[in-house]
């Protein structure tokens, strides 16, 4: 699936989902699934990634704020295996018996 690398924003970021499903994960293991109309708030300094699902597209508008002329710090890439594992875990936790 298409996703960002891990990154942080010194002044935060808002993700506005416009189509499909968007996954957002943080370094502490929290994964959110957002759908059209949802807004995901990424607080300043929180290490995170975001992207589409494994078998479906997702689109979002990212609104990023600046602090001292800087809006993002890019970090390490999220490997395909790690991404797949995180998205599958998030999907599994949302299933209803």
Which functions belong to the PLM regions below?
Residues 49-97:
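Double-stranded beta-helix
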Residues 21, 46-47:
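Acidic beta-to-alpha connecting loop that harbors the catalytic carboxylate
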Residues 28-45:
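Short acidic-glycine-tyrosine-enriched beta hairpin
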Residues 8-24, 63-66:
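Short, conserved beta-strand element in jelly-roll/cupin
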Residues 1-9, 44:
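Conserved short histidine dyad/triad with adjacent acidic residue
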Residues 10-13, 46, 56:
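Residues that flank catalytic or metal-binding motifs in active/ligand-binding sites
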């Amino acid at each position: 699936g298409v996703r960002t690398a891990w990154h942080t924003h010194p002044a935060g970021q808002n993700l506005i989902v416009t189509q499909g499903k968007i996954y957002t994960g943080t370094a502490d293991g929290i994964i959110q699934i957002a759908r059209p109309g949802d807004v995901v708030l990424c607080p300043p300094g929180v290490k995170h990634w975001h992207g589409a699902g494994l078998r479906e597209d997702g689109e979002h508008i990212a609104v990023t704020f600046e602090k001292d002329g800087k809006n993002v710090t890019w970090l390490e890439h999220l490997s395909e295996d790690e991404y797949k594992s995180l998205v599958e875990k998030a999907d599994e936790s949302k299933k209803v018996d």
